[in-house]
Regions:
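Histidine- and/or cysteine-centered catalytic micro-motif in compact active-site loops
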Residues: 54, 84, 103-104, 121-123
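Hinge/capping helix and adjacent helix->loop/strand transition within the periplasmic-binding protein
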Residues: 1-86
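Short helices/loops that flank or line small-molecule/ion binding pockets
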Residues: 42, 64-68, 85-99, 104-112
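Paired acidic/hydrophobic, glycine-rich loop segments that form the ligand-binding mouth/hinge
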Residues: 52, 97-101, 116-119
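A conserved hydrophobic position in a structured secondary element of the catalytic/binding core
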Residues: 26, 101, 130
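C-terminal lobe and pocket-closing loops
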Residues: 9, 19, 106-134
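Well-formed, non-transmembrane alpha-helical positions, independent of function
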Residues: 13, 37, 89-90, 108-109, ...
Length: 134
């Protein structure tokens, strides 16, 4: 006889293991260095700006940004990857202009000089990254 569990009712979370806010990334040679410069780039370009994304939540961050800027959807093109690491590889390779992925995925590449951190999609500063624009 099989035991049927309704996991949503049978288990309770006991700890938050990890939290990694989303971050906006660019190739180190990009002229964009801050969220404000990214906004100006999106508004000024005649063609869509490409964002490599590795998940649905990442796409929502880009959609939220464009809605706040009150720009049409044709100003930004999101390119879906199988995951955030693959998305960042194409930014580092110069194939895609920008990316939105968790900060924990991209920051080691910043330390290696292969990626530029433009800003964080967070309401509060992150420990160790207090100088990064929000």
């Amino acid at each position: 006889m099989a035991i049927l569990l309704q996991t949503i009712f049978e288990f309770e979370p006991i700890a938050n293991i990890a939290k990694s806010p989303l971050a906006f990334w660019a190739h180190p040679s990009s002229k964009v260095n801050t969220p404000e410069e990214l906004i100006n780039e999106i508004k000024a370009k005649q063609r869509p700006i490409n964002f490599a994304i590795g998940g649905g939540g990442h796409k929502l961050a880009v959609e939220y940004l464009t809605s706040k800027l009150n720009v049409s959807g044709d100003k930004v093109e999101t390119i879906m990857y199988k995951g955030p690491a693959q998305a960042l590889l194409d930014v580092m390779g110069g194939h895609v202009e920008f990316s939105v992925t968790p900060v924990a995925v991209g920051y080691p590449y910043v330390q290696a000089g292969k990626l530029k951190l433009i800003g964080l999609a967070s309401e509060v500063p992150i420990h160790g990254l207090e100088k990064v624009p929000l």
